[in-house]
């Protein structure tokens, strides 16, 4: 049996871009866990049986949209707090690059995302934590590089 080639959690990177030309991307400090969700919007339609119209119909599904969501949790780092707040305050979506690095290839998505929410929390005597949620704004273009 061949073992799968896997990667570590730190190799899933969430990066925000600046306003330079070309855009320079950097991963804001502080995430200890992150998650990437790829969604497809579907529209249901009943597919009747032409030979037996009274039979129960099967459901067909048509793809209507694609979407990406990114979330992350970790410590609220002084080095990145303003980066996250600036992105959240922006009326416009911000440049974003999401990378998933394996030993032999890297899968990346580049596009624009909105910082949907930032949650900060803390207990007495412990470090302040953060939870951040982002949503795609238009197409996130996928590339694979060896």
Tell me the role of every PLM-derived stretch.
Residues 2-73, 114-128, 133:
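Solvent-exposed edge beta-strands and adjacent loop segments
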Residues 15, 77-116:
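Short, acidic/charged, Gly/Pro-enriched secondary-structure junctions
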Residues 137-142:
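Hydrophobic lipid-interacting interfaces of membrane-associated proteins
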Residues 144-146:
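Short acidic DE-rich linear segments
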């Amino acid at each position: 049996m061949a073992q799968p080639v896997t990667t570590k959690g730190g190799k899933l990177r969430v990066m925000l871009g600046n306003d330079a030309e070309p855009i320079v991307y950097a991963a804001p400090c502080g995430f200890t866990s992150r998650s990437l969700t790829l969604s497809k919007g579907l529209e249901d339609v009943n597919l009747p049986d032409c030979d037996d119209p009274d039979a129960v119909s099967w459901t067909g599904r048509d793809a209507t949209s694609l979407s990406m969501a990114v979330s992350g949790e970790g410590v609220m780092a002084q080095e990145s707090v303003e980066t996250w707040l600036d992105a959240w305050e922006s009326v416009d979506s911000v440049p974003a690059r999401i990378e998933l690095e394996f030993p032999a290839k890297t899968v990346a998505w580049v596009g624009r995302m909105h910082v949907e929410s930032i949650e900060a929390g803390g207990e007495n005597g412990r470090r302040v934590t953060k939870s951040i949620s982002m949503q795609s704004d238009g197409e996130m273009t996928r590339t694979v590089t060896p």
